[in-house]
From Swiss-Prot:
PANTHER family: INNEXIN (PTHR11893), INNEXIN-5 (PTHR11893:SF36). Its main location: membrane. Residues 389-447 are annotated as: Disordered. Structural component of the gap junctions. The lineage of its organism: Eukaryota, Metazoa, Ecdysozoa, Nematoda, Chromadorea. The keyword Transit peptide does not apply. This is Innexin-5. Keywords: Cell junction, Cell membrane, Gap junction, Ion channel, Ion transport, Membrane, Transmembrane, Transmembrane helix, Transport. The chain crosses the membrane at residues 30-47, 108-128, 198-218, 283-303. Residues 426-438 have a biased composition (Acidic residues). It is a multi-pass membrane protein. One of its GO terms (biological process) is monoatomic ion transmembrane transport. It comes from Caenorhabditis elegans. It is found in: Cell membrane; Cell junction, Gap junction. InterPro entries: Innexin.
């Protein structure tokens, strides 16, 4: 089934054509953005020095490296107001304040969490592409054909040929799905013609649920007090309040550790600079606003497709607006054969209307109009053929049934043959006589 597309379809490199712009912002653009950010953060951790600590003078280089590694793995804590003025600490005893100060232990996990967030954005797309493959109308292949046609813009006739071919293929798939006894007998949701839009709405809801989950991840992972921390951080930056006051993404923190020798245990409190937080602040503040934008776009897209799915008249008007531009539809209007409602409801079904909208969004109005015009012509030709066949069947005379069962009563004669049967028998006898009079001279008779 898919192989018929290969002669005129280029390799399908991305599934962007099987959804709308809101989906692409989620699974494609946002996932790419998060993946790139994860690479940058991982490089700053494992290639550079993510944390640098001020250790006592008696520490050797090995001790210093141990202290920095320990503090990076264990985590540090921030002293509010301790570094507000020229590095003069307002807290004289970190040991007394450590239990009341916020711990900073998220920077070690930033690359891993970013990768997880990127996967969550891509997960609804995987679900969409996996389940729509169970439908006879393969969205990926149909979208690939329309995308291939969009890349040829130099010659209008080429566009028309592509749109016409796509319309024929689309109609063929719809007709097979609508007429196939396999789908009718099973009574599955695929046969109802509403599978694709229902699945698409479910995927839209998953995209929106992922946005809500992402806000929760940011709030919990960064240990902020409110999910609006992104806006609050932006306001603080505009007002000149830096991390020394707010404590969000602190650059300078404290770390406590102990070193044991042969006779005693020595406790140390050192001051560390978390270099990675400088980059993490920019990444996460930007991502918060990006997440808000994608969330609003997803809500609008979900509302748009929900209205289209629930109001059948909206889908009809969409198809009518493109059919009215085609000569095939105008010809039917002139004849008085106005049957677009049957075309939309019986031929396209909600699945076909849904795919037509995706084609329009990715290939343009002209392509969609030519495609629907070709499909409408094929539909009218098919309906005319059905009507003609029905008239022929009704015009045929009903022949009397012949009882071919053996009867023990020899006196009961066979029913007389009908006129058509008698003519057939007469012609057969004439053919036999002709064969006897004119034998085949090339035939070899057995001795």
């Amino acid at each position: 089934m898919i192989g018929v597309l290969l002669p005129y379809v280029r390799k399908f490199q991305r599934s962007a054509e099987s959804n709308d712009i809101a989906d692409r912002f989620s699974y494609q653009y946002t996932s790419t953005l998060l993946g790139f950010s994860a690479i940058m953060m991982a490089a700053s951790q494992y290639v550079g020095r993510p944390i640098q600590c001020w250790v006592p003078a008696q520490f050797t280089r090995t001790w210093e490296k141990y202290a920095e590694t320990y503090c990076f793995i264990k985590g540090t804590y921030f002293l509010p107001g301790a570094f507000a003025s020229e590095g003069e600490m307002s807290v004289t005893s970190p040991d007394d304040a450590v239990t009341a100060t916020p711990q900073v232990g998220y920077y070690q996990w930033i690359p891993i969490v970013l990768v997880l967030q990127a996967f969550l954005f891509y997960l609804p797309s995987i679900i969409w592409r996996t389940f729509n493959e169970s439908c006879e109308l393969k969205i990926k292949e149909l979208a690939a054909v329309s995308e291939a046609s969009r890349k040829i813009k130099s010659n209008m006739s080429d566009d028309q040929v592509k749109a016409t071919k796509f319309g024929r293929y689309f109609f063929k798939k719809l007709n097979f799905r609508n007429e196939s006894p396999v789908f009718k007998e099973t009574g599955s949701v695929v046969a109802s013609g509403k599978f694709l839009p229902a699945l698409y709405l479910l995927v839209k809801i998953l995209y929106l649920a992922n946005i809500v989950l992402q806000f929760w991840i940011l709030t919990y992972f960064l240990e902020t007090k409110s999910w609006m921390w992104g806006w609050q951080t932006f306001q603080d930056l505009m007002a000149g309040r830096e991390w020394e006051t707010t404590g969000i993404f602190p650059r300078v923190t404290m770390c406590d550790f102990s070193i044991m020798d042969l006779t005693s245990v020595h406790d140390h409190s050192i001051q560390c600079v978390i270099v990675i937080n400088m980059l993490a602040e920019k990444v996460y503040v930007f991502f918060w606003f990006w997440l808000l934008f994608v969330g609003l776009l997803t809500v609008c897209s979900l509302a748009y497709w929900a209205v289209i799915y629930m109001l059948q008249s909206v889908g009809r008007n969409f198809i009518y607006s493109y059919l009215q531009q085609t000569p095939e539809f105008q010809t039917e209007q002139e004849r008085g054969s106005f049957v677009p409602a049957n075309f939309v409801d019986k031929c396209l079904t909600p699945d076909g209307v849904f795919i037509s909208r995706l084609v329009q969004q990715n290939s343009g109005d002209l392509f969609t109009s030519i495609m629907l015009g070709e499909m409408f012509s094929l539909y009218r030709a098919r309906e005319a053929e059905k009507a003609h066949k029905k008239d022929d069947d009704s015009a045929l005379p009903a022949s009397a049934p012949v009882d071919l069962q053996e009867d023990d009563d020899d006196d009961t004669p066979f029913p007389p043959p009908t006129k058509a049967v008698a003519e057939t028998l007469t012609s057969d006898d004439e053919e036999e006589e002709t064969d006897v009079d004119s034998p085949d001279t090339t035939a070899t008779l057995p001795r």
